[in-house]
């Protein structure tokens, strides 16, 4: 039976809830140059453009139709019922994991629902989109809050905590990730090095160079609940469940 699980989630899990992804063919990068909306330099050049870009995602997330799907709910169930240690690391900046009930959660790329003071680095929960009362309350004069999002060229958040968890886990699961963007792409190597079982859940069939031991190909909303049930039943993931 597993004692220490690390789960990594990427854009694929949120796409099943109706959120557009950054890197798909019809995704947001098609409408903007990356350097204009997702770099510190782009923000320094045109903060209003960057705010509009993230406001469009904020509004989509709060439109009333985007909700956690079965995969989000299954991971929240795993947290509630699993007797061992669990850490869910997400590359997503939405709050669908939180809405599903997950609390043992780390947003390595930041959170769309928060702004950050550029001077103190204190974060603030956003009740409204950027541009509406978006000054900090920690400085005099108040500083303009920037999106609490990790941009290209910036260090992902919580890396020490993530690596500590990977060093000690006996099961690593990646759900809906491309597996091509570092440092997250290297998490499977770390887990394998420390003897963990590694499982990938993805819509696409695995690359022949994949380092994962097991692959589940299909929708996260269908496969993750089955995976969670297997874990909670005290069974080891095997070829009967994975490819």
UniProtKB/Swiss-Prot annotation:
Q: What is this protein called?
A: NAD-dependent protein deacylase
List, separated by semicolons, the cofactors it needs: Zn(2+)
Which Pfam families does the UniProt entry name for this protein? SIR2 (PF02146)
Q: Where does Zn(2+) bind?
A: 117, 136
- Reaction catalysed by this enzyme: N(6)-acetyl-L-lysyl-[protein] + NAD(+) + H2O = 2''-O-acetyl-ADP-D-ribose + nicotinamide + L-lysyl-[protein]; N(6)-succinyl-L-lysyl-[protein] + NAD(+) + H2O = 2''-O-succinyl-ADP-D-ribose + nicotinamide + L-lysyl-[protein]
Instruction: Tell me, in one coarse class, where this protein mainly resides.
Output: cytoplasm
Give its localization: Cytoplasm
Q: HAMAP family recorded for this chain?
A: Sirtuin_ClassIII
Q: Which Enzyme Commission numbers does its entry carry?
A: 2.3.1.286
**Similarity-based family:** Belongs to the sirtuin family. Class III subfamily.
Sites binding substrate sit at 54, 57
- GO terms for MF: histone deacetylase activity, NAD-dependent; NAD+ binding; protein-malonyllysine demalonylase activity; protein-succinyllysine desuccinylase activity; zinc ion binding
Please describe what this protein does. Answer: NAD-dependent lysine deacetylase and desuccinylase that specifically removes acetyl and succinyl groups on target proteins. Modulates the activities of several proteins which are inactive in their acylated form.
Q: Which residues does the entry assign to the active site, renumbered to this chain?
A: 109
The first-level EC class reads: transferase
Task: Cite the binding residues for NAD(+).
Answer: 10-29, 91-94, 176-178, 202-204, 220
The entry's other comment says: This protein might be subject to alternative promoter usage and might also encode a protein with a 7 or 13 residue-longer N-terminus.
What are the entry keywords? Answer: Cytoplasm, Metal-binding, NAD, Transferase, Zinc
Deacetylase sirtuin-type domain location: 1-234
**Gene symbol?**
cobB
